[in-house]
């Protein structure tokens, strides 16, 4: 309701007054909380927790209980600087204003991660405006297929029923076989027919009227440096539109206008990250043309203005308000 500030401290969720007083601990989780997102009605909250996972690494095998080594049996066993011995899962919980309880794992029994490691955060999940649905990002693959694939999808989770729908693939879709020893470019997975999303699909956001979900979308599987497009999905018809195609570069971040017809995004052009506007018809226009970089973007409440950070080679990050 805008009267409290929620924050994480030592792996637990807290709330306080805007002046820093009245700090109250809301959770007492045995597993540390890594991220959170309250529903628009304030009655539910998403909690990110990492669960133990030993699908590819067996630590301290039974016959060597004092060993510190790891027995690796499959990919993917490591992300950059850490071994894959845990996996983040999103939990949805009820909140009565004082305590968080009745937690349910959105991926219960599934050996997948959400948010996606190693860089994903709570921005990979989003509440619908009516607080009944969660859109989340997930790459539902394991082993070698997980390690060589960039094919993540956007899923809709119905909080009441627990049902899940994939917005990127039709029901019953099965991946074609992939030869891990050859380039993905020439394989069948990147030559699909129909409106399939085969690359990275991440960071969903519902439109304010709840009729659309937008997300960043790459076209090809196995191509980590593919161009990030801006995909808009019509929840009533299932139609997808890519509304930033007239901008020949990446969509780095975006947000919806309150009218649910206009979107703002930032992207790099000629070595500068500026701000742009598009609509459901894909009519793109530049809002800024600065020799600086915008690093984040969001709407400033219901004012119709945009709040963004901006920096340059000679200036640290500052917050700016932009009137489109």
Residue spans for each PLM region:
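Residue-level detector of Asp-centered blade-edge/turn motifs that repeat once per structural unit
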Residues: 1, 40-41, 129-130, 208-209, ...
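Short, solvent-exposed loop/turn segments at conserved positions within beta-propeller repeat blades
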Residues: 8-9, 82-87, 145-152, 222-228, ...
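Hydrophobic or amphipathic alpha-helical targeting/insertion segments
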Residues: 11-58
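Hydrophobic beta-strand positions that form the internal "hydrophobic ladder"
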Residues: 2-5, 45-46, 134, 210-213, ...
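Predominantly five- to eight-bladed beta-propeller fold
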Residues: 47-109, 137-140, 144-155, 184-189, ...
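Conserved beta-strand position repeated across blades of beta-propeller domains
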Residues: 37, 126, 205, 255, ...
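Multi-bladed beta-propeller domains
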Residues: 1, 16-32, 94-121, 146-150, ...
């Amino acid at each position: 309701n805008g009267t409290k500030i929620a924050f994480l401290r030592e792996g637990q969720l807290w709330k306080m007054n805007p002046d820093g007083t009245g700090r109250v601990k809301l959770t007492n989780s045995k597993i540390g909380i890594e991220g959170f997102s309250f529903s628009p009605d304030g009655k539910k909250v998403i909690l990110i927790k990492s669960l133990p996972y030993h699908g590819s690494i067996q630590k301290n095998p039974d016959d060597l209980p004092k060993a510190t080594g790891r027995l690796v049996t499959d990919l993917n066993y490591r992300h950059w600087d850490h071994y894959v011995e845990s996996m983040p899962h999103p939990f949805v919980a009820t909140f009565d204003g004082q305590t968080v309880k009745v937690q349910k794992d959105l991926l219960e029994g599934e050996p997948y991660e959400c948010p996606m490691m190693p860089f994903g955060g709570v921005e990979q999940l989003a509440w619908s405006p009516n607080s009944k649905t969660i859109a989340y990002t997930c790459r539902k693959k394991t082993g070698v297929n997980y390690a060589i694939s960039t094919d993540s999808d956007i899923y809709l989770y119905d909080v009441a029923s627990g049902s899940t729908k994939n917005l990127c693939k039709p029901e019953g879709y099965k991946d074609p076989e992939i030869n891990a020893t050859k380039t993905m470019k020439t394989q069948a997975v990147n030559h699909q027919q129909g409106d399939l999303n085969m690359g990275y699909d991440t960071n969903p956001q519902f439109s304010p009227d709840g009729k659309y979900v937008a997300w960043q979308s790459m076209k090809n599987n196995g191509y980590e440096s593919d161009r990030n497009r801006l995909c808009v999905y019509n929840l009533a018809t299932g139609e997808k539109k890519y509304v930033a195609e007239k901008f020949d570069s990446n969509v780095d971040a975006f947000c919806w206008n309150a009218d649910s017809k206009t979107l703002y995004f930032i992207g790099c052009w000629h070595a500068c990250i500026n701000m742009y506007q598009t609509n459901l018809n894909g009519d793109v226009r530049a809002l800024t043309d600065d020799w600086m970089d915008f690093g984040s973007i969001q709407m400033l409440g219901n004012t119709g203005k945009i709040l963004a950070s901006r920096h340059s080679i000679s200036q640290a990050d500052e917050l700016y308000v932009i009137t489109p």
